[in-house]
Amino acid sequence: MINKKLLFLVFALAKGVLADEEDEYEEDYNMNPELENPGMFKHVDWRDFRLEFVILACFFLYVFSFITQKKKNQKIASRWYGSLQSSFRQQFAQYGPGPNSSPIIYDSPTEFSSYLTGRLNVKNVYTTLQLFPRQDLLAYSLNQIVEILLGNVMSSVLPVADRFQFDLTLADQNLKAERFVFAIVHKDCMRILREIRYDLSFTRISSSPYLPETHVLMSENNECSQAIFEIPEFMSSINECIENLEYFIVTDQPSVPPATEKDYVTKPRIEASIRIKKITSLSGLSNATGSALFNSLLLVADSCPKFQWRPEVSKKLTSARKLAFEQVVHASAAKAAKKKVKSSGDISKLSESDQKKRMERERQRKMRRRAKKM
């Protein structure tokens, strides 16, 4: 009985304490009107969105820069090609892809091109104006860092820059002219071009009294080099653009290493590139170097059909091309044989029924090929 009374007393005390705490909590809650009806943005401050503001500012800055710098590249291309237009139209019957279209072809925000045809000794000319990606701040910064820290020492391609390139193909009637490889290359581009261009593997590197210390001569034979250097007005035109000249290549061999004999296509042509340095303003943009390089290409194109080498020189050049073709054929055959051995090994791992099915498919494929030939 005493225990029951004691338990009842403890229960009553506990209930009283809890009731007092609830009353106190209700009073505190009612005393704070802000907690009674808190608004959605009552406690939101602009400083809580500082990161978002920074991200939006960077985004709008990027968009603004992309639009303005893209227009700047277009203005540079228009001014550059416009200043060369008179020379192009004077030398060629057609400037641009068609009579009713713009002569400047927009390939990308950083690349513009054009086309020339209709001239003696020249089949066609493709020109390309590659501009630095000014519209992309991130790419621009990364390229600047690479240029400063590494330059083109660790790169397998020419560094991104403002440059103007020519790709001139000689006319078909010049296909029987003497074949050779000749190049004037800037020392900064020599290693890269030697690695990526197949045709320059035919040449030897040497210095020349005709060239400054910044450039080297890459040629198959001294007689070929001397013939080009002695073309009237050629050296005067080259010297006008030599400061910006990256390479001037006369070749008949493919620039990309041929994988098979079908890829080994010879085409007499002249390729050249100049680097446009420090475009600070459109008003100060000059294309004197572009005009000089263009004139140099035409002088060589007109002289190539007239070149005649001594018999021993012609024999040496012909032997080098025959050997190169045989090496390509041999490498292609070795690759095909290796692939065939691998295929035979794969067949041997199949079951007998699968081997028969595969052999039957091969037999049917050969029969269809014969039927097409007939």
Swiss-Prot record:
InterPro entries with a match to the protein in the record: CCDC47 (IPR012879)
Domain of life assignment: Eukaryota
Locations listed in the record: Endoplasmic reticulum membrane
One term under GO cellular component: PAT complex
Glycosylation sites: N287
Pfam families given in the database record: CCDC47 (PF07946)
Protein name: UPF0674 endoplasmic reticulum membrane protein C2G5.01
Lineage: Eukaryota, Fungi, Dikarya, Ascomycota, Taphrinomycotina
